[in-house]
């Protein structure tokens, strides 16, 4: 799905998400190349409505040669935490509901652009 050269976090259903990160070495695409979707919010394309939580988004008035906005994503899994009996000890305990965090960063500046946290059901 990331072939359209933009990054996004989309909630498809309560248990299904789609994440893409790109482009890394090529131009982004205009929103008009992607069905004129919004940058975020509800979007229906075909039979399914989805919730675009965040995306890179570029209007068609930007020359294609200027669409050079790389984005990368770091995925962090929080499934255990340290719960030592003594201050200098280590004891890993499982979270009852693990968490995954998708963190999108600007590929040129390294600044955080968006983060989405999901807890297991």
Q: What positions do the PLM features span?
A:
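Long, structured stretches of catalytic cores involved in phosphate-ester chemistry, encompassing
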Residues: 1-121
């Amino acid at each position: 799905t990331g072939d359209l050269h933009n990054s996004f976090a989309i909630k498809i259903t309560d248990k299904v998400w789609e994440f893409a990160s790109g482009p890394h070495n090529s131009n982004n695409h205009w929103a008009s190349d992607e069905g004129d979707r919004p940058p975020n919010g509800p979007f229906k394309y075909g039979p399914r409505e989805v919730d675009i939580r965040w995306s890179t988004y570029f209007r068609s008035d930007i020359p294609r040669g200027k669409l050079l906005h790389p984005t990368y994503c770091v995925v962090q899994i929080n499934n255990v935490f340290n719960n030592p009996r003594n201050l200098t000890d280590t004891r890993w305990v499982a979270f009852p509901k693990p968490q995954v965090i998708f963190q999108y960063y600007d590929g040129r500046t390294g600044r955080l652009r968006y983060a989405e946290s999901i807890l297991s059901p």
